[in-house]
């Protein structure tokens, strides 16, 4: 029998429901249970694919090509369970499905309403595709009291009643602010949040209280009294130095024990947290430090590059070093003298992005790395900019550019040729300039073949790989021979000969990839490209 755990949040947003869900999933796994995590997002977008990174943060892409919330990245990094399209639903998708059913006549002339039609659609999502999981953890986005979240809260209330309290647990994450002038943690915001949730028919069974210090026993009992919860089920979610310390911290607070006790499951014995204690030890006691410059467009909101930052941390864990990230807006390098800021970094990474703003700065960063022999890692747009730089300054194609940015004389990157169609499984995908923007990129996992003896083949330890993609433009294979003659190697190609990886053999470490390797990296299984990149940065640190 599958059991369901619903995680809601109150008081303020950004308390860490996604991390809390991921950490609980990891703890249940460590006790031998099989888990899956899902996210209900209350916005009206069908998916976050067309949302600004400044508003939403990164878009996390799954193997099956879904553009999803960044919390699914936390789920996958903590549990190792590959996320899928069905693990993230939005209000927009729910309403689209309901309206499509109404147009087909599925409701047989009924007046279509939020209750029961929208809530039924949400419940169908929660219960869909369950196989042999012991637990389904379902995070509800937003904060209790938000208008947008109301249908989701009503749906999980109904769902809990339908499966019975023995199979449904409601966890509420709140904030316990410390007021220095009073010298104490204040419980009133938590009390009001629980009351708001109760007004929607949901009694929280466990309270997870975010705090910067331990909760005194008298305060714990006070919360329990006013929130109608047992004192032992008021759990402190303490601030920690590393997010990978959260599972260990939660276990020490008894979180997983109380979850199992609620369901009447055995609580004896300890979970195997050795992988987490080992990771935390490496994070706390690194043997050195390297500085990586991340030259991007959205550096004022670091959530735009959440998986990337974590993957670099994973590379540091694998090499037992601390990775210090220097976030640089690529626009500053459009002033040629500003590139000197890169003089003392040990590696340069140019991540993905869209549009023309800051592109010349990215090209200049790639040029600096190539000419100064600094390790360079270009991801998606960062690979394309590196190829344009090589075309201009190595092959002499001075008007090389991308059709994404205008109409260059030589479209080294563009929506053209092979990039207008490709195979996905047994179906042919086609794109044109007039295709809708949402959900039409090359998305999800695709295979590639690596050149034997190349740097990337050495890094991967194989010549056959699969990686996740999210892009609309591609390096134009027409220029392949011309660029290879001047020292750029196309070391990875798709089965239909789309360029996937480029490298410069005559360079300590210069690799560009069209895909997003950061999406598959985990703290206990770092992606080989990030491990190798940080290793190269360590070597560079000895030269600077």
Curated annotation (Swiss-Prot):
InterPro entries: Class_I_gatase-like, CTP_synthase, CTP_synthase_N, GATASE, GATase1_CTP_Synthase, P-loop_NTPase. The keyword Protein biosynthesis does not apply. Residues 1-265 are annotated as: Amidoligase domain. ATP binds at residues 14-19, 71, 240. Keywords: ATP-binding, Glutamine amidotransferase, Ligase, Magnesium, Metal-binding, Nucleotide-binding, Pyrimidine biosynthesis. Catalyzes the ATP-dependent amination of UTP to CTP with either L-glutamine or ammonia as the source of nitrogen. Regulates intracellular CTP levels through interactions with the four ribonucleotide triphosphates. This is CTP synthase. The lineage of its organism: Bacteria, Pseudomonadati, Pseudomonadota, Alphaproteobacteria, Rhodospirillales.
């Amino acid at each position: 029998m599958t059991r369901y755990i619903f995680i809601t949040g109150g008081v303020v947003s950004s308390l860490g429901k996604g991390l809390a869900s991921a950490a609980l999933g990891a703890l249940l796994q460590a006790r031998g249970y099989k888990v899956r995590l899902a996210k209900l997002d209350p916005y009206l977008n069908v998916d976050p694919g067309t949302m600004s990174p400044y508003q939403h943060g990164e878009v996390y892409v799954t193997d099956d090509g879904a553009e999803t919330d960044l919390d699914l990245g936390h789920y996958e990094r903590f549990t190792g369970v590959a996320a899928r399209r069905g693990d993230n639903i939005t209000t927009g998708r729910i309403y689209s499905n309901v309206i499509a059913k109404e147009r087909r006549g599925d409701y047989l002339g009924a007046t279509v309403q939020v209750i029961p039609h929208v809530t039924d659609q949400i419940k169908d999502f929660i219960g869909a595709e369950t196989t042999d999981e012991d637990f389904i953890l379902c995070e509800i986005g937003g904060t209790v009291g938000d208008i947008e979240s109301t249908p989701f809260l009503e749906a999980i209330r109904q769902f809990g009643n339908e499966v019975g309290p023995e199979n449904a647990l409601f966890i509420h994450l709140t904030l316990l602010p410390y007021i220095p002038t009073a010298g104490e943690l204040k419980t009133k915001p938590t009390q009001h949040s629980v009351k708001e949730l109760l007004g929607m028919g949901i009694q929280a069974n466990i309270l997870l209280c975010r705090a910067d210090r331990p909760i005194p026993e008298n305060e714990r009992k006070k919360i329990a009294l006013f929130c109608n919860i047992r004192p032992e089920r008021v759990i402190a979610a303490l601030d920690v130095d590393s997010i990978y310390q959260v599972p260990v911290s939660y276990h020490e607070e008894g979180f997983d024990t109380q979850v199992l006790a609620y369901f009447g499951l055995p609580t004896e014995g300890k979970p195997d947290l050795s992988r987490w204690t080992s990771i935390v030890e490496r994070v706390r006691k690194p043997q050195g430090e390297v500085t990586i410059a991340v030259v991007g467009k959205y550096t004022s909101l670091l959530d735009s590059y959440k998986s990337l930052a974590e993957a670099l941390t994973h590379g540091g864990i694998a090499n037992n070093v601390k990775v210090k990230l220097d976030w640089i807006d690529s626009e500053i390098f459009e002033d040629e003298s500003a590139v000197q800021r890169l003089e003392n970094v040990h590696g340069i990474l140019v991540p993905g992005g869209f549009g023309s703003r800051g592109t010349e700065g990215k090209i200049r960063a790639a040029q600096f790395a190539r000419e100064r022999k600094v390790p360079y890692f270009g991801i998606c747009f960062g690979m394309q900019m590196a190829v344009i730089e090589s075309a201009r300054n190595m092959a002499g194609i001075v008007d090389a550019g991308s059709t994404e940015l205008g109409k260059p004389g030589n479209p080294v990157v563009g929506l053209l040729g092979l990039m207008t169609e490709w195979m996905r499984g047994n179906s042919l995908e086609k794109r044109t300039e007039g295709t809708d923007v949402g959900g039409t990129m090359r998305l999800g996992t695709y295979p590639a073949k690596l050149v034997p003896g190349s740097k990337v083949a050495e890094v991967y330890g194989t010549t056959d790989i699969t990686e996740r993609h999210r892009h609309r433009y591609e390096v134009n294979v027409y220029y392949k021979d011309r660029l290879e003659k001047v020292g750029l190697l196309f070391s990875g190609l798709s089965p239909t000969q789309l360029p996937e990886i480029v490298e410069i053999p005559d360079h300590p470490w210069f690799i560009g990839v069209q895909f997003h390797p950061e999406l598959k990296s985990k703290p206990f299984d770092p992606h080989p490209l990030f491990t190798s990149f940080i290793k190269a940065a360590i070597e560079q640190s000895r030269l600077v």
